[in-house]
Each structure stands twice: as structure tokens, then as C-alpha cells.
Amino acid sequence: TATRGECKGTSHWVDFAWDNPEVTFADILEVFGELPIPPYLNRDTEESDKETYQTVYSKIKGSVAAPTAGLHFTPRVLDALQEKGIDLEELTLHVGAGTFKPVKSEEIEGHEMHTEYISVNRSTIKKLIDHDGYAIAVGTTSVRTLESLYHIGVTLAENPYATEEELRVKQWQPYEKYDQIPPVVALQKILGYLDRNGLETLHTSTQIIIAPGYNYKIVKAMVTNFHQPQSTLLLLVSAFVKGNWHTIYD
């Protein structure tokens, strides 16, 4: 059974209950859930989408939608990139349902960003530190993850013993911190945190909203698709190109 609970902003808590302890919530979603696809496809979800509407490198279940920029990367393309000496690193962001939520408020301050869970391996963070060239993010999911790393590092620079709750990136946090540090230093702070806690992977969450006025710290280039009007992803792109997104879309 599903029972609607407390209302929080434009969202609701929903309580799920079932009798069989051997059945997981993931099992229930597989049976009763429907894979969400972008509205611009103008069609219903098809059974084949479970296989074809996925990136070839996806491994961990948890997102409500595929990171669509990654759909363009076939095994052949990935092999060609590596043959050219381009290093490929993987990270995880579990895309939240809020990725489909348009901005309806008059001012961006009135939009509540969704929380997404991220995981980044120590080896990836170390490569970002040692890498002299561009860090190219594939998709806005990777952008949000990489940029969140910087702000996690800023938190650790202020408090090396920050709790898991304190490491979570809040929506407006990037715009409230004025004592900035170099990206390499921020990433080194994360490595120090992993060392102190005997961890190989950083697990946390982010509510970051990237909008015009945001100063990118780690991402130097990105691969992304076109985005819907009123989308927070369009704000992210606008911030990256300093408001010149109209030229790109024209």
C-alpha cells in the first residue's frame, strides 16, 4: 500500500508498506514503476527502454532517469577516445525526480532544488589533482558532481572533521562562501578526509543549483544536450557560457 504523508513545499512524503519481508522496495518499483523518459520524446515508455535508454557504462541502480548526454557514447566512441590518450573516469550521481521539475517561480530564489546522492572514488579525485589538462564533464549530472566536490573541499578546509551531514552541499552554499581556495587544495582536503576515515570512496549528497553568477571551479568543458525551457539545466549551461546560451540555441 502507498499512503501520502506530510507535504514539504511542492513535494510529499509517501509511505510504502508490504507484507513479504523477502521483497525489497527495488523489487516493487520494478513491478509497478515506470521508467521516466523525457517529455520531448512525445511517447509512452516502452519495455525496450529498460535496455536501450541506458548508457553503455551504467552499472549501479538508483537514478530515476538516464544521464542522456552519455547515451551518445558507444563502446566504439569510448575506445577511440582512449586510443587518443584521453583518460576516462567514472563517478556516480543518482539522478533525482526533481530533474524533471521546471522553474515556475518568478525568481530563482523561489525554486527548491532536489537532493541527489553522489559517489566518487579516491582514484578519480587523485587524477583530477594530477591532471594538467581540461576536465571535461559528460552531462549535467557529472557537472553537478564535480562542482560539488569543490564545495565539499571548502567545507573540509574550514572543518577537517566535518560530519557526513555537514559535507552535504546545500542549494545556495556555493554563493555564500566568500573565502575561496584553489580547486587542487579543495580536492586535497577530500583526500585527507578519506585518509582519516579509512575510506576509498566519498559518499555524500548534493543539492547544488548552478545558475548565472556561479563561478565554475573544476569543470572546464562539458558535453550536454539541448534542454527544455524553464529547466534548471538551462541555467547551468547559461552560467557556463556566461549567459550566451541564446547564440548556441539559435
Regions found by a protein language model. Name each.
Residues 1-250:
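Surface-exposed, charge/polar-rich loops and edge strands
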